[in-house]
Regions:
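Extracellular/oxidizing-compartment recognition motifs
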Residues: 1-170
Length: 170
């Protein structure tokens, strides 16, 4: 009977704001830096039921500028799985599309299909995601200009440790 009649709460003096679920805070002070990054282009050791292993064309030291050309894949390792917002500063020709595919793990075991791998060893594994092929991805198309562009989609976040980046142009 007591709970059937609403009463005004006079003890709380703050603002009540609408929310659907838990609050999420953007903590730039906890940003992760890459611990390893490499570009791969070709694959070796592929067999009927194995994708093979990536051939690393070049590696990047921490803090150095990274480049990726058409036909190459840049893999960036942040050292631990996290819920995070990717942030990029890059430059490319007008019309170039940069595709970023976050992943929680790399393919291993020579990309053995029997182990559930979806690509060559050393590439980003995405088959474990709810929408592996079209979901959890960023596509950025460059406009005209010769300046670097900063891209920081702060209204969303992803769970990942690795990021696979490809480009349609230089």
């Amino acid at each position: 009977d007591k709970l059937s009649t609403p009463e005004e709460n006079t003890e709380f003096s703050g603002d009540i704001l609408p929310s659907d679920g838990a609050e999420v805070y953007l903590r730039t002070d906890l940003a992760l830096a890459p611990v390893k990054a490499y570009v791969w282009k070709n694959v070796e050791g592929a067999k009927e039921n194995e994708f093979g292993k990536v051939i690393i064309a070049r590696e990047f030291a921490s803090g150095t500028e990274m480049t990726v050309s058409p036909g190459e894949t840049l893999v960036v390792d942040f050292g631990q799985n996290c819920a995070s917002v990717p942030s990029f500063v890059f430059k490319a020709a007008e019309g170039t599309v940069l595709t970023c595919l976050p992943a929680e793990l790399l393919n291993d075991g020579n990309g053995a299909k029997i182990r559930g791998m979806d690509g060559p060893e050393g590439s980003c594994h995405r088959e474990n995601l709810r929408i592996p092929h079209t979901g959890i991805r960023l596509d950025y198309t460059f406009a005209s200009g010769d300046n670097y562009v900063a891209y920081y989609p702060h209204c969303t976040f992803f769970g990942y440790r690795y990021v696979s980046i490809t480009s349609t142009g230089n």
